[in-house]
């Protein structure tokens, strides 16, 4: 589902199908990062930044415990990695994939990086940025949510079940 997208035909085009398949493949890469976080005892959230040609130019997973840094969220690490790769602070033609809806802090950073797209898996009803305001993101950033949502949600649920 996309926000504020122009009216489209109810019948998916081949471009829509290709984009969905690509989104799922790239969300699987973010899930690999989330699994790495889980293995490190971190909340399992993962993120990847993808260039317009489909190359992954930034990866990140939560490292708040290991780094003892409350800002070491998957998105922040992936964005910083991509900026280093490009040698630029703006990611205007890139797409950020993240397994869980970003928090307000990460949404603010995403706004300043200005990616073309933000794609997330599962919604975060407690601390996701949309609980505060959808206006945090840059107005030109296209948002898609719900990609592999069940897989993303299950990884989080399993992590918290294992910790109890």
Kindly give the residue locations of the regions a language model identified.
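Zinc-dependent deaminase
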Residues: 1-40, 56, 102-164
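Short, basic and Ser/Thr-rich N-terminal targeting/leader segments
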Residues: 41-45, 92
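Short beta-strand scaffold segments in enzyme catalytic cores
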Residues: 45-54
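A short, polar/charged loop-to-alpha-helix boundary motif
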Residues: 66-76
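Short hydrophobic alpha-helix segments
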Residues: 58-60
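Immediate flanking context of iron-sulfur cluster ligation sites
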Residues: 88-101
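Stable alpha-helical structural segments in soluble proteins, enriched in small hydrophobic residues
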Residues: 30, 37, 74, 78-82
């Amino acid at each position: 589902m996309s926000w504020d997208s122009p009216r489209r035909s109810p019948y998916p085009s081949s471009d829509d199908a290709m984009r969905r398949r690509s989104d799922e493949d790239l969300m699987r890469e973010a899930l690999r990062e989330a699994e790495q976080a889980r293995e490190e005892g971190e909340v399992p959230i993962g993120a990847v930044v993808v260039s317009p040609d489909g190359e992954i130019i930034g990866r990140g997973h939560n490292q708040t415990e290991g780094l003892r840094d409350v800002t070491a969220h998957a998105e922040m690490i992936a964005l910083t990695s991509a900026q280093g790769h490009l040698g630029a602070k703006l990611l205007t033609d890139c797409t950020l994939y993240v397994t869980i809806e970003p928090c307000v802090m990460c949404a603010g950073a995403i706004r300043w990086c200005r990616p073309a797209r933000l794609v997330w898996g599962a919604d975060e009803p407690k601390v996701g940025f949309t609980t505060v305001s959808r206006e945090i993101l840059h107005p030109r950033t296209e948002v898609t949510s719900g990609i592999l949502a069940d897989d993303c949600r299950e990884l989080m649920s399993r992590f918290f079940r294992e910790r109890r």
